[in-house]
């Protein structure tokens, strides 16, 4: 796949602001931005961070071509000096981020940028694009996977995705979230995600008889024979013809691995009937795969109804996150450097949830030592260190009277260095390692946090030092207004 030049994939105001910083001699002022989100999609208890690998690729390749400069000259908005500066533009700052697959919560940084103002401002759009999209799909996929209760979930959404990147990177994110495979072939080629597939109704229709279609497919792919049985009549012909094809082709070869797929109708009822027919024919190991506009709600319902399903194929409602299709990540200035000192900045809003947490920060995840269970996340000023040998008092940053003292704990920093002085210092894990890490980290959360409806709120608290800084800034801004 040839690389695209994504340098100008930015909101236009990133360029006008960058030009403004440059012209006003603010371009080299060191600034700090946090990328975070405010609400978990679908009212869930946590989200899954994804998309960092694409951020890394973008930052590494970031440069303006001659064609880019000519386009910007044509706009007649930018100074000649600024355009000349862009000819040698490279990212020279620092980036910290949570590893992909990490469960994350509202209000905490998924990524922090420290860089000259021009650079930090310009990269905003693409960073949000990467993390918003893939975190959304990884989060949705994980909900679907957890609803399936251990049954494999295949990502089947390419044809309903919103564009090619939506399909390719959506499959990547879905795999991080726990899907077992994808129907998107290029995602296998690019990322090593297992590609899988059965057949379409058109295959069956191309033959004079349904049986001929099934027999031919079994002969061509005897070790991968999953037959689509709902083209005409599932119980009357589809399953009987599948059994006949298995008898005549697979059984003589000693192959027991086979499957059928249901793509329409009452899949709970049909799966029960199909299981009975297959078992009576001796195909107790035959897998029943179902698709047909599934999501976590439908999957939970049909499992409760006793559906006999082994594998779920989930398409449009996963790849588009149909029930809540926006992640809502934002990118906000939190500090600047003045004479080598970090000066915190705050954004104030009439909506309390939109007031930002200022300063260059660390994010600690606090775990119980005995169980390894995550208790809370703690935002601290960058120079704070948690002493694990002493009791730690946590308090709700809004309802400050709610306090908890934890002992016998350990703390883990979530933000890790990705770029230092413009150089990548982080080695991205392969996709299987990311998926494994995601599963392991979700296991550290309380079951109550993982509820689909009305989950227990996982606390993201502020250290005393950070809370006091935030409160002082609020008071000062309030007096100025």
Segment roles from a protein language model:
Residues 196, 260, 288, 310-312:
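Hydrophobic residues within beta-strands of alpha/beta enzymes
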Residues 1-31, 39-41, 77, 83-105, ...:
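Buried, small/hydrophobic-residue-enriched core segments of structured protein domains
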Residues 70-71, 139-143, 157, 450-457:
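Short coil/turn segments at secondary-structure boundaries
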Residues 75-83, 163, 390-398:
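Short, positively charged
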Residues 201, 291, 315:
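Residue-level "edge-of-site" marker
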Residues 1-29, 33, 38, 43-44, ...:
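Gly/Ser/Thr/Ala-enriched C-terminal appendages of enzymes
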Residues 31-87:
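N-terminal, Lys/Arg-enriched amphipathic/low-complexity engagement segments
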């Amino acid at each position: 796949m040839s690389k695209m030049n994504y340098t100008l994939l930015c909101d236009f105001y990133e360029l006008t602001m960058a030009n403004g910083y440059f012209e006003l001699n603010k371009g080299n002022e060191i600034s700090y931005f946090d990328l975070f989100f405010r609400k978990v999609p679908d009212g869930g208890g946590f989200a899954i961070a994804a998309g960092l690998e694409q951020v890394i690729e973008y930052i590494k390749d970031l440069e303006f071509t001659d064609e880019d400069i000519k386009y910007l000259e044509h706009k007649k908005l930018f100074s000649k000096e600024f355009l000349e500066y862009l000819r040698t533009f490279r990212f020279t700052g620092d980036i910290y981020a949570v590893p992909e697959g990490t469960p994350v919560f509202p209000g905490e940084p998924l990524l922090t940028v420290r860089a000259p103002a021009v650079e930090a401002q310009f990269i905003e759009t693409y960073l949000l694009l990467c993390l918003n999209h893939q975190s959304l799909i990884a989060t949705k996929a994980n909900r679907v996977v957890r609803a399936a209760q251990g049954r494999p979930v295949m990502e089947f959404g390419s044809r309903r995705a919103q564009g090619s990147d939506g399909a390719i990177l959506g499959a990547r994110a879905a795999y991080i979230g726990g899907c077992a495979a994808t129907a998107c072939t290029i995602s296998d080629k690019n990322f090593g995600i297992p590609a899988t597939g059965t057949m379409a109704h058109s295959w069956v229709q191309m033959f004079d008889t349904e049986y001929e279609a099934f027999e031919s497919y079994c002969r061509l792919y005897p070790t991968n024979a999953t037959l689509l049985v709902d083209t005409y009549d599932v119980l009357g012909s589809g399953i009987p013809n599948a059994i006949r094809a298995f008898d005549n082709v697979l059984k003589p070869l000693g192959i027991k691995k086979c499957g059928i797929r249901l793509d329409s109708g009452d899949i709970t009822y049909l799966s029960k009937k199909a299981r009975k027919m297959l078992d009576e024919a001796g195909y107790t190991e035959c897998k029943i795969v179902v698709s047909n506009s599934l999501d976590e709600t439908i999957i939970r319902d049909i499992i409760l109804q006793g559906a006999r399903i082994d594998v779920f194929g989930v398409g449009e409602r996963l790849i588009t996150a149909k029930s809540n299709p926006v992640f809502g990540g934002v990118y906000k200035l939190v500090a600047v450097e003045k004479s080598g000192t970090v000066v915190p900045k705050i954004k104030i809003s009439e909506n309390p949830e939109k007031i930002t947490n200022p300063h260059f920060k660390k994010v600690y995840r606090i775990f119980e030592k005995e169980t390894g269970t995550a208790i809370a996340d703690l935002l601290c000023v960058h120079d704070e260190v948690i002493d694990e040998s002493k009791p730690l008092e946590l308090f709700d940053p809004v309802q400050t009277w709610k306090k908890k003292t934890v002992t016998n704990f350990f703390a883990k920093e979530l933000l890790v260095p990705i770029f230092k002085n413009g150089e990548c210092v982080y080695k991205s894990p392969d996709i299987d390692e990311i998926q494994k890490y995601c599963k392991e980290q979700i296991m550290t959360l309380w079951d109550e946090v993982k509820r689909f409806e009305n989950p227990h709120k996982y606390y993201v608290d502020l250290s005393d030092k950070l809370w006091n800084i935030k409160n002082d800034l609020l008071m000062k801004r309030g007096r100025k207004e």
